[in-house]
């Protein structure tokens, strides 16, 4: 979270960066206190589930601080609506849901727009699992790997898979969007972040217009790749035959995706007529 805060500092967007710094400091202190005072005992699947849920709740609460500080919604918003909207945006980011009530993100400071996409990217990076791996030995995390879509890989191998997906793929899609989409580098990074989180927090409301067909194609390809199981990516990069046995699931996913594409193509004219 310190990355978008530093970006805001460099760009001179102090209001945005201060809010993000507050979230970073609060999250770091809370994590340190809980890790210091908490008991490190072996985690079963039920306990792992509770830890993951509570971790995302805390992430979302602290992640809402920049929204509360900058108020990117509308003037005159009451405090309860401001908190609810901020918490919604933050939760939507860290859970990679991508749901947003901000209709014109292009009016936001560049660093804050980057922050929104960054929270989605961090959520897709399975930030909670990475933090857990730093503080707990692998023998105590046996139940955690099932959250990541595979029972055949060791937890450390899954972390390597996540790193490969989000570092290599992010770099590739930043270059593709910047080169062929004719979008500035900062928006290209933000768009790449949200693409690998399967969409949602775009930096501008017009970036996905139908005229940008090349950009749309790159984004769609990125979202499909990001939706594939972690174990499949691990098998591709490591040439592990056992890890690529999920081809049947992937085929079913692609068939369902194709059916819904045709369904929306059939429905789309009715929407046009209603407009």
Each model region followed by its residue ranges:
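Membrane-proximal intracellular helices of multi-pass ion channels
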Residues: 1-275
């Amino acid at each position: 979270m310190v990355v978008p805060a530093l970006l805001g500092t460099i760009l001179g967007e102090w209001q945005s960066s201060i809010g993000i710094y507050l979230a970073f400091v609060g999250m770091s202190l809370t994590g340190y206190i809980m890790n210091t005072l908490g008991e490190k005992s072996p985690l079963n699947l039920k306990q792992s589930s509770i830890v993951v849920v509570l971790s995302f709740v805390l992430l979302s609460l602290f992640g809402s601080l920049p929204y509360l500080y900058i108020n990117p919604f509308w003037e005159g918003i009451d405090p309860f609506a401001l908190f609810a909207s901020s918490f919604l945006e933050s939760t939507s980011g860290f859970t990679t849901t991508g749901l947003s009530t901000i209709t014109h993100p292009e009016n936001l400071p560049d660093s804050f727009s980057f922050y929104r996409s960054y929270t989605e990217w961090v959520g897709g990076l399975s930030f909670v699992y990475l933090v857990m791996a730093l503080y707990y030995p692998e023998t105590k995390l046996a139940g955690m790997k099932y959250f990541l879509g595979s029972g055949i890989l060791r937890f450390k191998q899954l972390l390597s898979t996540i790193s490969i997906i989000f570092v290599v793929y992010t770099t590739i899609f930043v270059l593709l969007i910047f080169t062929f989409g004719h979008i500035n580098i900062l928006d290209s990074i933000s768009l790449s972040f949200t693409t690998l989180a399967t969409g949602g927090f775009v930096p501008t409301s017009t970036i996905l217009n139908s005229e940008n067909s090349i950009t749309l194609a790159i984004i769609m390809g990125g979202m499909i790749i990001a939706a594939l199981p972690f174990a499949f990516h691990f098998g591709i990069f490591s040439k592990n035959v056992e890890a690529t046995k999920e081809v049947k699931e992937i085929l079913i996913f692609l068939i369902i995706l194709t059916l819904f594409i045709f369904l929306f193509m059939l429905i789309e004219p009715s929407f046009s007529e209603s407009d």
